[in-house]
Amino acid sequence: MNLKKYLLFGGVALGLGMTSCVGDLDLQPNDPNLVDTSDPNFKANALGICYSGIAVSGISGAGSSYVGGLDPGTSAYLRTIFTLSEFPSDELTWIWPNDEGGSIGDLVACTWSSSNTIVYGAYYRLLGHIAICNQFLANTADDTDAETIEMRAEARVLRAYSYYNMIDLFGQSSFITEEAEVGEEPRQASRLEVFNFIEQELKEIVDQKLISENPLYGRVGLDGAEALLARLYLNAEVYSGTPRWADCQARCENIIRRHQGGGFQGSGLANEYLYLFCEDNKQYMPGGSNKAENEILFGISFDQDMVQSYGGPTFIVAATITNTTVIPRQNYGCSAEWSSIKGIQQMAERFYGLSNDKRDDLWVRGVYSDEDYSDTFVGFTGAWGTTGGNVIIKFTGNTITKNPAAVDYSKPLTLFDGAYDANGVWQPNYDATTFMSTDQPIIRLADIYLMYTECYINGGVGGRQQALDYINLIRARAGSPAFNSSELTVKNLMDERSRELYLESVRRTDLIRNKMFVGPQQTVWQIKGNINNMEGTRIDDKYALFPIPNAVLNSQPDFKQNPGY
């Protein structure tokens, strides 16, 4: 069955029988008899919605949403995950802190409350996606053909991803599956219970190979499912109270083994880091054309004509490029420039002294020098707000140059199609658009290599030399010098994860797992505690979890709030 157009456009959501808004927690499965399962395209339509529920905010274009009470773009799935994962961390700030009634500024400063609108949007977005997946699974429960079994496995992985985000962000979770009776209400389940459910689901799918090792483009396959399981085990001590380093490392080894032979130094990694985040990164996706470098193990497809969303890469690109006097937005394939996201001092300092590292090649240096925190990076004050921010570019709407051998990293824009004019000015060869066709990575192979190393450092499992080799593989691809054995430390690992994975929605989780976000070992970062405080203050322990939104507690009086709220 060809799902391509359904994965891109999302199919006909009304065929699922879903309500148009989940703001009232109306998430129980609908009566399957209300769904027209006689439509020959029903399964493709329905599975397409399971995918597009992560990509878009609603079924009627970029301005529609099935989450009420919040701007559709702001409440888009991947955008809410990004916002809650990156803004409270030691990487980013949003320079318009009063946006969304101050909710964004509170996230940056780690001073949010249970009435925060972004937190509300994330909770309901996750539950809405879980409901969509449940609906598909309920309506295909009796089908036993091989194609449907695989489609069901994909929907289960996508649902597991939403439940993973739920326990990562909120701890306890509203919980319901496709086996619930019609009219049955979701109940509140503990973090441990949902952790066990996710583990059971993913282990069955991976170990029984219910999902393809060679999926079609845009669909989740064996690598994506096992990578999500590895990430679950990586954070097991936080989620379940019991570390699972050996289990995480074993899953990493499986994935690494399947990718040996091609790409950078035969590792399966893409040869060029920044190619992973531009418009034709589709070749690195599951089912992508570059089989030797399929580094993106789990990703979400976007298309500027068929998947228009102010979440995902469109949000990241538009928010990170800034005023045209600093970075002409056309140079990055985007017709919008929001001048919103900047890197804070701690993020900038991680690249200090690494002059050959390619991962910051699109960053902008040498402007607004009144807040220059180092010899390399420059902050923004005055008209930019008290942010200490740095212009950090990673995702673009550009396409890869046709001649990779000609890439000149001293002129970052030559990474992409174009040519120098008679005056020596680089002229990009593309039209800037509002919406990006860049796909969004969820888990990459580079993360798997770093997970293996962390399992050794934190759990003492595996070999020291192998752990060192794997982190140095990531550094070699970036152009940074190798660590020696004595440098295999938690601090260096965390800095390397930030350099490699910034803007990929993992930093808050990394900090919590390594006891650096709250508690006695936390580091004090800029802006924390007060959006106008450049020095920052310590973060209260309660902020290791987000609160259950007030709207949920009002509609479900038996639900309990997280401690401290």
Task: Outline where the language-model segments fall.
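Flexible, polar/acidic helix-loop-strand segments at domain edges
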Residues: P97-S113, G121, Q346-R444
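Short coil/turn linking the two alpha-helices of tandem helical-hairpin repeats
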Residues: I167-L169, S174, N235-G241, N458-V461
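Conserved, well-structured interaction surfaces
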Residues: P40-G48, S52-G58, L92-F170, E185-E193, ...
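Extended ligand-binding clefts on enzyme/binding-domain cores
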Residues: G263-I400
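Membrane-proximal, proline-rich intrinsically disordered regions
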Residues: C21-L78, V552-Y565
